[in-house]
């Protein structure tokens, strides 16, 4: 009896090819895994603080953000980060009274609905195309430097989870979260990754030297760059959690928390929108969509659709916030951090998403006991490299005018702690400089031609 095989339909073949492309490594596996943890310097402190202060459901947050990582890794084919909405988190824990989980969810859903509306109507794509590049670079520079400043404070001072800020007491030199540990992690990452150059760029530089010397240096640099430095440092931090507090083993409970839909009252919507969503919306538009699209073009030579990124942020939060998950967005700082430590494909964040799912399903809310003992100095080191990588995206501002706009925008953003304020000043400055160099002769010629045409029309005989 003959057996026949049915070939794949064209649509099935194209879908399989699309999935294979999305699941293809663009860097060695060790580098992709190292890059996957490159943005945890911001993720862990904010999640830990919201869990301890605002009673955030950690298990639900890990499960939903794990699904987000997997979905965005497949959708965008780059290490698209999933990070907390920082302005909402800051308001939730630093202002009195603290926001409740329902109010945090209302703020996240309000921000998400705004970004979804901007993306669906095409307004986000319009903004992306008309905003001057020096202004975007100014926002990126200010965000990167703010990350770096915060990272240095994490390394130098003890961390206060009640305020989401470093405390005034300096960090001790010795100990399992001391300065020596943080400095050792810093030196290890610098020696293994250098300034963050790609291998191709390093090979091009070495090609100009003598052949024997360049070959030995190339082998040494390839060996160093193959070390998953961020992954090793993060794994060391996890081990130190159990050494610092062995009672963690007794407090761990297996299984996720029960899913439930939050009850959000009208007062929760009002408080969440007025106190947290209003300052978050401009930051999400600038840093989570526009800056991410610009940075992806710089790092991966891939132009992302501002519409797709905006809708992605909207859909994620309109689903997860109703179950108590932390409001999240895509951040340029997280993208820069993951790229800095070796992530080049969407498979990197897929690995991260799988890890979050496993932790959320196995340990649930008890995982906060582990996070509470994680050395903050190590997180500061990871955050420092992410901030520097984001700030270095502004290196393409070659003209003095572009650099002037960028620096003014960054200075205002950092002084007022508001990316929206710096963005507004940058746009006004850009328009003033363009108005200053506007060719007035064209305006004069146009006015003269209009006057002459008016005289000719008056002199022409009218038909009776």
UniProtKB/Swiss-Prot annotation:
Task: Say what happens when this gene is deleted.
Answer: No visible phenotype and no effect on molybdate content in shoots when grown in soil, but increased levels in leaves and decreased levels in seeds.
Q: What superkingdom does the record give?
A: Eukaryota
InterPro entries, from UniProt?
Answer: MOT1/MOT2
Query: Which cellular compartments is it found in?
Result: Vacuole membrane
In the bilayer, the protein is annotated as:
Multi-pass membrane protein
Q: What tissues contain this protein? A: Expressed in leaves. Not detected in roots, shoots and seeds.
Gene Ontology terms, MF aspect: molybdate ion transmembrane transporter activity
**Predominant cellular place of this UniProt entry's protein:** membrane
Query: Where do the TM regions start and end?
Result: 33-53, 62-82, 116-136, 172-192, 223-243, 309-329, 348-368, 374-394, 404-424
Transmembrane helix as UniProt keyword: yes
Keywords attached to this entry = Membrane, Molybdenum, Transmembrane, Transmembrane helix, Transport, Vacuole
Position of sequence motif Tonoplast targeting signal: 8-9
The record's Gene Ontology biological-process terms are: molybdate ion export from vacuole; molybdate ion transport
**In the UniProt record, which is one GO cellular component term?**
plant-type vacuole
Q: Where is the signal peptide?
A: none
* Keyword Protein transport applies: no
Q: Which residues form a coiled coil?
A: none
Q: Spell out the family assignment given in the record's similarity comment.
A: Belongs to the SLC26A/SulP transporter (TC 2.A.53) family.
Its annotated function is as follows: Molybdate transporter required for vacuolar molybdate export during senescence.
PANTHER family given in the database record: MOLYBDATE TRANSPORTER 2 (PTHR31970:SF9), PTHR31970
Additional observations:
About 80% of the leaf molybdate is exported during senescence.
| Protein name listed in UniProt | Molybdate transporter 2
Organism of provenance: Arabidopsis thaliana (Mouse-ear cress)
Query: Which gene holds the coding sequence for this protein?
Result: MOT2
